[in-house]
Design a protein with these regions (language model features):
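Structural core segment of the AMP-binding/adenylate-forming
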Residues: 1-48, 363-365, 378
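Conserved S/T- and glycine-rich ATP-binding loop of Class I adenylate-forming
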Residues: 4, 67, 73-76, 109, ...
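AMP-binding/adenylate-forming catalytic core of the ANL superfamily
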Residues: 4-10, 158, 244, 250, ...
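AMP-binding/adenylate-forming catalytic domain of the ANL superfamily
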Residues: 30, 381-403, 421-429
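Conserved pre-ATP/AMP-binding loop-to-beta segment of ANL
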Residues: 51-72, 79, 102-108, 242
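Conserved AMP-binding/adenylation subdomain of ANL enzymes
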Residues: 91-108, 116-157, 167, 171-172
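Gly/Ser/Thr-rich phosphate-binding loop
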Residues: 152-160, 169-232, 243, 252-253
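Adenylate-forming AMP-binding core of the ANL superfamily, especially NRPS adenylation
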Residues: 191-195, 230-278, 286-289
Length: 429
């Protein structure tokens, strides 16, 4: 890369490794770097200096197949990897999401998501460019500041993560919210539960909530055209530009209704990532038998609708039963005192996984670990009742707000962890 775009919050870390970065000519910084910028051997410029536009035609049009950006994976199950993304893939993702949630030149899209994430770039910036609309990019997300920002920007479309949508739906009313009723017609992002979608419609007047799409940085695989009904819990149908299958551990295809690893391959050139930057071995691992192996567990129903089950590394096996951490987390988040949760494995002396729930309580909540466990006994299968529960002030997250489960797995049982075996709880089959 010759030009690097960096958020001011991460610039100091980049300065620390500047001596190892070869070929960089310019660093474009979004925001103000505290304590100034040191001499690092390349030009440092503010993105604000490049505001406006130049209507002069380009002397040379870019090759759609050429490398356009390095977008890093979320790093929730391990170290992040740089995905080599072409310009054509970037536009393909934007067009696919516009089919699911269209907007036009008179719309204003508001997003607080970081621009180093595929969501903000493709769903936000590129989609807006394709329709000729306007985008308002917030430096950060704030529940209390959301509606004032929507009012000030005139936003009619919002692109956020599902967890943020839940926080907003559960927040108290305010004057700006009342004034903006019906202003937002589309909320992009996932996952949104049916209850949260209903709250956005009734409280805020939004009409289209959630993206009904499934994909990774490497490839956007499913979506649903606007207006088509989707079964609850589904992420839509296979995108027509991809061949998507469900495989077992030996790469044999599985029939509808059976869960297995999601694999895909493109039916058109340059709509999927070109591999991981300088990680040929990792690229080879995920491209076994000429299929891209997503590392996700999913299934199709008889009608061709796709359902995400879990990350393969997060899929748990306990007492001979498979447990989806995704489904468990969705159930636990129904408790009014739980704000954030991660369900993950810890090592067991019995050879299988022991289940641990690491959670953050809502401010002021007095919920105990034992009380949460007793609440879960009545709501999850007996084999999914966790052995361990631990409350924390904060959970480790990446810049997109996703919990870094691999860190929690590595930490395992800590001195602050509650053990069901120390209680009087008896789980009945």
């Amino acid at each position: 890369a010759e030009i690097v775009v960096c958020d001011a919050a991460y610039a100091p870390r980049l300065f620390e490794v500047a001596g190892h970065l070869q070929g960089i000519r310019r660093l474009l910084v979004r925001g103000v770097v505290e304590n100034g910028c040191p001499d690092v051997g390349f030009a440092i410029e503010s993105l604000d200096d490049h505001r406006g536009h130049d209507t002069t035609p380009l002397a040379e049009l870019p090759d759609p197949a050429a490398l356009n950006a390095l977008i890093y994976t979320s790093g929730t199950t391990g170290p992040s990897k740089g995905c080599m993304i072409s310009g054509n893939q970037m536009c393909h993702v934007a067009r696919l999401l516009l089919r699911a949630a269209p907007f036009g030149p008179n719309d204003v899209l508001w997003t607080p998501l970081p621009l180093f994430h595929m969501n903000a770039i493709a769903t936000g910036v590129v989609s807006t460019l394709l329709v000729g609309g306007t985008i308002s990019i917030a430096p950060r997300f704030s529940v209390s500041g959301f509606w004032p920002a929507v009012e000030a920007s005139g936003a009619t479309v919002v692109s956020i993560l599902g967890a943020l949508g839940t926080l907003l739906a559960q927040a108290p009313d305010n004057d700006a919210m009342r004034r903006c009723f019906g202003q937002i017609h589309t909320v992009k992002g996932n996952p949104f539960t049916e209850d949260i979608k209903a709250m956005w419609r009734t409280r805020f007047g939004a009409r289209h909530i959630g993206s009904n799409a499934y994909g990774l940085t490497e490839a956007l695989i499913t979506s649903v055209p606007a207006g088509e009904p989707v079964p609850p819990g589904s992420s839509g149908r296979c995108a027509p530009e991809f061949d998507v299958r469900i495989f077992d551990d030996q790469d044999n295809p599985l029939p509808p209704g059976q869960a297995g690893e999601v694999v895909c391959r493109p039916l058109h050139p340059d709509i999927m990532f070109k591999g991981y930057w300088r990680r040929a071995e990792d690229t080879q691992k995920v491209m076994g038998n000429m299929w891209f192996h997503t590392g996700d567990i999913g299934k199709f129903d008889e009608a061709g609708f796709f359902y995400f089950v879990d990350r393969k590394k997060d899929y748990l096996r306990r007492r001979g039963e498979n447990i989806s951490s995704f489904e468990m987390e969705s159930a636990i988040l129904q408790h009014p005192d739980i704000e954030q949760v991660a369900v993950h494995a810890v090592r067991s002396n019995l050879g299988e996984d022991d289940l641990k729930v690491t959670a953050k309580r809502v401010a002021g909540a007095q919920l105990t670990e034992e009380a949460l466990c007793r609440w879960m006994v009545d709501r999850v299968p007996y084999y999914a009742v966790p052995r361990y529960i631990e409350f924390r002030v904060e959970l480790p997250v990446n810049p997109q707000g996703r919990v870094l489960k691999y860190q929690l797995r590595d930490e395992g049982v800590t001195p602050a962890t509650w053990d069901i075996e120390s209680s009087t709880i008896k789980v009945q089959r």
